[in-house]
Amino acid sequence: MSAQVIAIDAMGGDFGPRSIVQASLACLSATPSLHLTLVGQPSLLEELITGQSAADRARLTIVPASEVITMDEKPAQALRGKPDSSMRVALELLRDGKVQACVSAGNTGALMALSRFVLKTLPGIDRPAMVAAIPTQKGYCQLLDLGANVDCSAEHLLQFAVMGSVAAQTLGIARPRVALLNIGTEDIKGNQQVKLAATLLQAARGINYIGFIEGDGLYRGEADVVVCDGFVGNILLKSSEGLATMIAARIEALFKKNLASRAVGALALPLMRRLQADLAPARHNGASFLGLQGIVVKSHGSAGVQGFQSAIQRALIEIQENLPERLHGRLEDLLS
C-alpha cells in the first residue's frame, strides 16, 4: 500500500499538543503506511514523542511554526497577523504537495478562512462546507453544512448536496439518498431558499434526491446525506452530542439509584457500554471541509485522544478515496 502523509496542526485545540500528539502516535503505530508531519514548537513536540520505536519515529517529521492561533482569535486576524502559525504552515504543506491532508483541532473560523486562502476552492464551488457522520438507527448519515456557512442560497445548498453525495459514495454507498432538512416534508414547507434548492435538486443529474426530511427522519436513517445551512446544522450537531451525553448520564444514574437497580445495571452494563461507545461524540469526531483543493479535517477543539484519532482516520479514508479529485469530476458533470 502506498504511503499516506498527513500534516497535524499540533498546537491547535483547547488543551494544547499533548492529546493531539498522543493520538497521532497511536494512529502511527496502528497504520504502517501512515506518515505524519507534526507542525508546531519543536522543543515541546520533541518532549512529547520520546519513547517511540525506531520504525515509528522514521515515519514522523516535525516542522517548526513559531505562532499559535488561539481559539478566540478572529479569522481576519489569523489570516493577516500570523503568517507562521502552526495551522497556516500545515495548510501550506498541503498546498505545496508535501502532505496529502491536514488535520486541526484549532479555531474553526480561522481554519476555514486560511483553508480558502491557501488552498482555494474547487471550480464550481462558491463556499466549502463542513460535513460529519451522524449516527442513526440504520447506521450513519452525512450532515452538512455544520457551521461554515450560516446564510446559504439555494445554489449553495445544491453544491452541498453534490459534495455530500460524493462523500457518502467514498464510504461505500453506491447511490446515496439525499434530502433537505426542513420543518416538514410537504412541498409548501420551508423558507424560500430551501424550496428553491428542492427545485434545483429535482433537476440535477445523478443526484438521488428524495425530498424534504425532518429531524426525526434523520435519526431514523431515512437519508444518507442531509443538507442544511450551517446555522441549522451546527445547532443540530451540538444538540445531538449533548443529548447523547445526557442520555448516557441519566441511564447511569438510574442504575445506581438503589440496590435493585444496581443489580439490573450490572447485568445490563456490557450492553450499555457498547451503546455508549457507539454514540460517543469522540467516535464520530472529525468534520471534513468539502469543496477545497485539498483534504482538511476539523477536529473538535475539546477532543481527547480517541476523538483526535477519529479525525485522523477520516483524513486517511479521504486520501485513500481521492476525495478532492472525485469531487472535481462530479462537479464538472453536475454543475456544468
From Swiss-Prot:
UniProt superkingdom: Bacteria
Pfam families reported for this sequence: FA_synthesis (PF02504)
EC number in record: 2.3.1.274
Residue ranges crossing the lipid bilayer per the database entry: none
GO molecular function, one term: phosphate:acyl-[acyl carrier protein] acyltransferase activity
Keywords: Cytoplasm, Lipid biosynthesis, Lipid metabolism, Phospholipid biosynthesis, Phospholipid metabolism, Transferase
Family: Belongs to the PlsX family.
Summary of subunit composition and partner proteins: Homodimer. Probably interacts with PlsY.
Name of protein: Phosphate acyltransferase
Source organism (scientific name): Pseudomonas fluorescens (strain Pf0-1)
